[in-house]
Amino acid sequence: MKVGIIAAMEEELTLLVDRLDNCEEVQLGHCKYYTGQINGVEVGLMRCGIGKVNAAIGTTLMIDKLKPKCLINTGVAGGFINEMNVGDIVISSSVRHHDADATAFGYELGQIPDMPSEFQADRRLVEMATKVNLKSKARIFEGPVFSGDSFIHTTEQVENILKNFPQIMAVEMEGASIAQTSHLFNIPFVLIRSISDKVRETKSADTYTQSMEESAKNSVQVVFEMVEQLKEGM
């Protein structure tokens, strides 16, 4: 069983790298790629960089090098629903672009031509993630995650996304490209994102800066528990 784990930033990946046995590091273009074992499971860790293009490149490199049985995207996200607190976890039920628009040709808003309108996360991976017992007070939610190449922090941005996608639970900048690449290569995936800021609040960028590193620890804990479960396969 080989598991691919992808994060955008070093801060989102460091705790996982520290737990790797027999760790080897390789630079692949702009991406840092680590291989080794966690709890006896062979894993690849990829720091892909921020944004959808970087994420697609990193995911493709990961698939080519590791040939994983599944992909997990870990990191942080902005929360859209009021019940969520900073540090809570969102497990993706589905993932979608919020900044794609080919509606002139009959596609849904957020749909890339010739792609599904949204990418469904693997139900087995979702169920594994949602059943994890966190050691912290953080809660686990499941719902739609949306991606775009902008940090969402203004009232105008928030209102525009809510108008078009009222079902949104969280927003970030890589997941839809990771999901789309996984879809193209027919590899099961799931996003595990910890809430670093609440986008409807003022100064969400400040909250992100202050809480990002601590919030990322919660998503990493879910990943550790999932890897343990994946010892038995999917």
Swiss-Prot record:
Binding-site residues, substrate: 78, 152, 173-174
Biological process, per Gene Ontology: L-methionine salvage from methylthioadenosine; L-methionine salvage from S-adenosylmethionine; nucleoside catabolic process
Catalyses which reaction(s): S-adenosyl-L-homocysteine + H2O = S-(5-deoxy-D-ribos-5-yl)-L-homocysteine + adenine; S-methyl-5'-thioadenosine + H2O = 5-(methylsulfanyl)-D-ribose + adenine; 5'-deoxyadenosine + H2O = 5-deoxy-D-ribose + adenine
UniProtKB keywords: Amino-acid biosynthesis, Hydrolase, Methionine biosynthesis
Family annotation (SUPFAM superfamilies): Purine and uridine phosphorylases
Pathway recorded for this protein: Amino-acid biosynthesis; L-methionine biosynthesis via salvage pathway; S-methyl-5-thio-alpha-D-ribose 1-phosphate from S-methyl-5'-thioadenosine (hydrolase route): step 1/2
GO MF, one annotated term: methylthioadenosine nucleosidase activity
Active-site feature positions: 12, 197
Classification via Pfam families: PNP_UDP_1
EC number: 3.2.2.9
GO cellular component, one term: cytosol
Domain of life: Bacteria
Family classification: Belongs to the PNP/UDP phosphorylase family. MtnN subfamily.
HAMAP family linked: Salvage_MtnN
UniProt xrefs under PANTHER family: 5'-METHYLTHIOADENOSINE/S-ADENOSYLHOMOCYSTEINE NUCLEOSIDASE, 5'-METHYLTHIOADENOSINE_S-ADENOSYLHOMOCYSTEINE NUCLEOSIDASE
Function, in words: Catalyzes the irreversible cleavage of the glycosidic bond in both 5'-methylthioadenosine (MTA) and S-adenosylhomocysteine (SAH/AdoHcy) to adenine and the corresponding thioribose, 5'-methylthioribose and S-ribosylhomocysteine, respectively. Also cleaves 5'-deoxyadenosine, a toxic by-product of radical S-adenosylmethionine (SAM) enzymes, into 5-deoxyribose and adenine.
Name under which the protein is recorded: 5'-methylthioadenosine/S-adenosylhomocysteine nucleosidase
